[in-house]
């Protein structure tokens, strides 16, 4: 639970500080903000950085925040630079007067939409030993649905902050954003959006926001929604309806957090991002911006996961596992072999166990002069050496052909084979994808090098015998 230490102090002027857990009647972890939001709203507050630190220590907060100066959304570069410098100065003042090591102190990063200032702020805060680091000023970005800019801000801060410390995002309260924020490395959030939205009759879901007046019935199974209707909640809005709606909004926030954690456990967070990205154009922009940082995400993605992955089309091409595979592909095959046998990578995983081509792959798997490579719609060129590795053999994908995607994959296959400098290439063409690969390889390799077999017409034994004859001629 999070509350505002500045408002508590102002509301109890002249009274001795009391334990915040007792004030809230809540025995769990309590975090207290320092009044920075009030600075953003009103320009100043009547408290010093030293005073608010001392007050938070006296009320026994569990997580405390120094009194920073938010940059906001509309600050120009000069103002942004000043807020960063002033926040650093206030951090130093706060650190000098802290006496309790049992409180987790939070160091805010400022800079707003000015990414160089965000990075500079994060670098300065990283020099100071805070238990938690946080990014400020995102609220207006979220209200205007500039989620792509928020992603840039998070990356600018995260790349210079200590990796072993939690990262908090102030004001992130809409469940639709949780999967995206977690994917970018946010560990903690706080927001009063669940209550503020409820006052305005706004109903939160994991796919967006709805107005009660536009709804006929609730599809949510939470206790606040079962047994009532949007019309009934609207009629009682001044009495209990606002509370009921706030309860639903809070419930859906916790539900989405549980869904995100479960997706992480199963190694399916990227699939959740793909699903959520189709709920709104702004979320699609957010997803596309995250995809641009795929190489950064790859560094912290486990090499092996408890479950396989889903390939859902071109939106899956920037998932961290795919980026890792592409980066390691060039060094996966020896160039010394004279003949490359290119087989279809169809529905069966691993590809060499495909009933139609299993005997062909088996016949040449250990041949000293043959390299086997599969062409997969999800992965492009897949050397047999990687056929049983994660996540190639654990990928579920649809082979329904997108002509653009098929063409792009065929080019990747051709580019990979070029790097092997083979004396001969034998392609077994199968389906639309096989025909696209045929077209690309025909552009790349001379007729004396390239041999093409129709896998849909020839039986496996005929293919094996033809390849053997090709090897004899090359000897």
Where are these regions (language model features)?
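Catalytic cores of glycan-processing enzymes that make or break glycosidic bonds
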Residues: 1-46, 96, 110, 117-121, ...
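Non-catalytic, usually N-terminal nucleic-acid engagement modules in DNA/RNA processing proteins
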Residues: 1-100, 309-336, 343-420, 428-475
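Short, solvent-exposed loop/turn segments at secondary-structure junctions
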Residues: 7-9, 36-37, 70-72, 112-114, ...
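Long, low-complexity, charge-dense
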Residues: 61-66, 88-92, 103, 263-290, ...
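Glycine-rich phosphate/ribose-binding loops and adjacent secondary-structure elements
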Residues: 88, 97-226
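Gly/Ser/Thr/Ala-enriched C-terminal appendages of enzymes
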Residues: 192-285, 409
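Flexible, glycine-rich loop/tail regions that form catalytic "lids" or insertion modules at the edges
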Residues: 289-322
């Amino acid at each position: 639970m999070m509350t505002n230490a500045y408002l508590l102090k102002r509301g109890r002027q002249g009274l001795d500080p009391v334990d915040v857990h007792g004030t809230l009647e809540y025995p769990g972890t309590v975090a207290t903000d320092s009044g920075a939001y009030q600075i953003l709203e009103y320009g100043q507050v009547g408290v010093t950085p030293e005073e608010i630190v001392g007050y938070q220590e006296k009320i026994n907060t569990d997580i405390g925040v120094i009194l920073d100066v938010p940059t906001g959304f509309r600050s120009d570069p000069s103002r942004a630079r000043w807020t960063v410098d002033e926040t650093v100065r206030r951090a130093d003042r706060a650190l000098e007067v802290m006496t309790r090591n049992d409180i987790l102190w939070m160091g805010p990063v400022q800079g707003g939409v000015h990414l160089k200032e965000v990075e500079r702020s994060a670098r300065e805060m990283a020099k100071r030993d805070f238990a938690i680091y946080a990014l400020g000023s995102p609220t207006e970005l979220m209200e205007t649905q500039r989620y792509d800019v928020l992603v840039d801000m998070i990356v600018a801060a995260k790349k210079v902050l200590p990796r072993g410390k939690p990262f908090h995002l102030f004001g992130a309260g809409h469940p639709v954003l949780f999967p995206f924020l977690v994917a970018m490395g946010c560990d903690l959030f706080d927001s009063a959006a669940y209550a503020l939205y409820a006052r305005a009759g706004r109903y939160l879901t994991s796919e967006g926001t709805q107005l009660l007046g536009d709804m006929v019935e609730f599809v949510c199974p939470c206790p606040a929604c079962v047994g009532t209707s949007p019309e009934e909640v609207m009629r009682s809005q001044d009495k209990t309806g606002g509370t009921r709606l706030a309860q639903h909004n809070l419930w859906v926030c916790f539900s989405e957090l549980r869904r995100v954690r479960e997706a992480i456990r199963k190694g399916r967070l990227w699939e959740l991002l793909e699903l959520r990205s189709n709920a709104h154009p702004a979320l699609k922009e957010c997803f596309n911006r995250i995809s641009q940082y795929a190489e950064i995400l790859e560094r912290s993605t486990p090499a092996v996961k408890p479950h396989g992955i889903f390939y859902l089309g071109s939106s899956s091409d920037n998932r961290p596992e795919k980026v890792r595979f592409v980066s390691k592909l060039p060094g996966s095959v020896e160039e010394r072999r004279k003949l490359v046998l290119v087989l279809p990578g169809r529905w069966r995983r691993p590809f060499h166990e495909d009933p139609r081509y299993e005997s062909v792959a088996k016949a040449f798997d250990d041949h000293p002069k043959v390299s086997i490579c599969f062409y997969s719609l999800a992965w492009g060129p897949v050397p047999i050496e990687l056929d049983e590795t994660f996540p190639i053999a654990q990928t579920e994908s649809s082979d329904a052909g997108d002509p653009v995607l098929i063409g792009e994959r065929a080019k990747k296959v051709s580019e990979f084979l070029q790097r092997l400098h083979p004396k001969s290439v034998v392609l077994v063409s199968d389906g639309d994808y096989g025909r696209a690969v045929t077209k690309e390889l025909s552009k790349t390799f001379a007729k004396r090098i390239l041999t093409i077999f129709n896998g849909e017409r020839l039986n496996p034994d005929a293919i094996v015998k033809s390849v053997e004859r090709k090897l004899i001629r090359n000897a």
